[in-house]
Amino acid sequence: MMSMNSKQPHFAMHPTLPEHKYPSLHSSSEAIRRACLPTPPLQSNLFASLDETLLARAEALAAVDIAVSQGKSHPFKPDATYHTMNSVPCTSTSTVPLAHHHHHHHHHQALEPGDLLDHISSPSLALMAGAGGAGAAGGGGGAHDGPGGGGGPGGGGGPGGGGPGGGGGGGGPGGGGGGPGGGLLGGSAHPHPHMHGLGHLSHPAAAAAMNMPSGLPHPGLVAAAAHHGAAAAAAAAAAGQVAAASAAAAVVGAAGLASICDSDTDPRELEAFAERFKQRRIKLGVTQADVGSALANLKIPGVGSLSQSTICRFESLTLSHNNMIALKPILQAWLEEAEGAQREKMNKPELFNGGEKKRKRTSIAAPEKRSLEAYFAVQPRPSSEKIAAIAEKLDLKKNVVRVWFCNQRQKQKRMKFSATY
């Protein structure tokens, strides 16, 4: 701090400013008021705004030193340092909500120099500095804006233009709180009762953002209420649609049942089905007795095998009307199953007809073959009963034993014929 104070005379560019090294708190407002006066138009220094900013910081740090040395007799107020008491309140056009908007009426304690630097470099002041730099409509700032905003003839520059203590004071004829374009925030980080008119934003969005009580309902609550209302309406509509759909399904089901019953009980339909069943049964090569016995294989509850006469009476339409109606779905199920099996047989003839056309050659083991040769030596032409007994004893099929005896006789005949000739 002392190094900055020692460099202070080298950066004093305003001829109207006196050389105050440690101005008092009462004279600091007068010095700041003189510092905020517009720059002479013929000044050739291009870094006037930077010089003003450095000068303002040096004076503020000097005021802090005096406040610390004097103790609690002169409590330091950041707002009192950077704002005059008779400054004109500015209505802010910015709607950016402040990060800390707490109204407290007690005085601040004396700040240390490090605290003041932290206070100057806080994010809220950076936000206000950016907003102050945006107020170019009031007159345009210099090349290097200070923490207070745009420094120039028309802009609110230096400590008065939204400095470390907050926003508010106007700087120059065209300044007035950031100019007509309004780049300055209307409130400070720590507003005081005398800045009450500057600290409030009249925009409803800003009031909502600052969590201030408002007469308007919260948009989230409105959206939630609308969402729940829409969900309830949708649920009611869905329930109504489900009820209507169930009623329509019941009506359609009843109509379908009535149509099915009508088609089943129609005598002409029964007659046409009986004729069609007879023709398809004959085409399949199945007798009426086979149909009656095959009905038991369908495993329909309450349905067993039927006699051949029942199938014949159905085809000739001599059964009663109720029996015809009861027998029609059973015969239709059998007919569909028989036709399906016939189609599979036609599609794969090698599986069904191959076994019948080409029978696998039978192979007899050696022990059974020796036993058969012994029986053949005793009796080359056994009777049918003897062949059955031999087959049962050797655990062979009767037809296999019969064919073996026949083949063995033919073999013996060929052997005798070859020996003779």
Swiss-Prot record:
Residues 94-117, 133-200 are annotated as: Disordered. The keyword Ribosomal protein does not apply. GO terms for molecular function: chromatin binding; DNA binding; DNA-binding transcription activator activity, RNA polymerase II-specific; DNA-binding transcription factor activity; DNA-binding transcription factor activity, RNA polymerase II-specific; DNA-binding transcription repressor activity, RNA polymerase II-specific; GTPase binding; RNA polymerase II cis-regulatory region sequence-specific DNA binding. GO terms for biological process: cell migration in hindbrain; cellular response to cytokine stimulus; cellular response to estradiol stimulus; central nervous system neuron differentiation; habenula development; heart development; innervation; intrinsic apoptotic signaling pathway by p53 class mediator. Residues 262-339 form the POU-specific domain. Residues 133-186 have a biased composition (Gly residues). Keywords: Cytoplasm, Developmental protein, DNA-binding, Homeobox, Nucleus, Transcription, Transcription regulation. Its main location: nucleus. Residues 99-108 have a biased composition (Basic residues). Gene3D superfamilies: Homeodomain-like, lambda repressor-like DNA-binding domains. GO terms for cellular component: chromatin; cytoplasm; neuron projection; nucleus; RNA polymerase II transcription regulator complex. Expressed in mature osteoclasts (at protein level). Brain, peripheral sensory nervous system and retina. In the adult nervous system, predominates in the medial habenula, superficial gray of the superior colliculus, red nucleus, mesencephalic nucleus of the trigeminal ganglion, nucleus ambiguus, inferior olivary nucleus, and peripheral sensory ganglia. Interacts (via N-terminus) with RIT2; the interaction controls POU4F1 transactivation activity on some neuronal target genes. Isoform 1 interacts with POU4F2 isoform 2; this interaction inhibits both POU4F1 DNA-binding and transcriptional activities. Isoform 1 interacts (C-terminus) with ESR1 (via DNA-binding domain); this interaction decreases the estrogen receptor ESR1 transcriptional activity in a DNA- and ligand 17-beta-estradiol-independent manner. Multifunctional transcription factor with different regions mediating its different effects. Acts by binding (via its C-terminal domain) to sequences related to the consensus octamer motif 5'-ATGCAAAT-3' in the regulatory regions of its target genes. Regulates the expression of specific genes involved in differentiation and survival within a subset of neuronal lineages. It has been shown that activation of some of these genes requires its N-terminal domain, maybe through a neuronal-specific cofactor. The C-terminal domain is able to act as both DNA-binding domain and a transcriptional activator. The N-terminal domain is also required for transactivation activity on some target genes acting as a discrete activation domain. Neurite outgrowth and expression of genes required for synapse formation are primarily dependent on the C-terminal domain, however the N-terminal domain is required for maximal induction. This is POU domain, class 4, transcription factor 1.
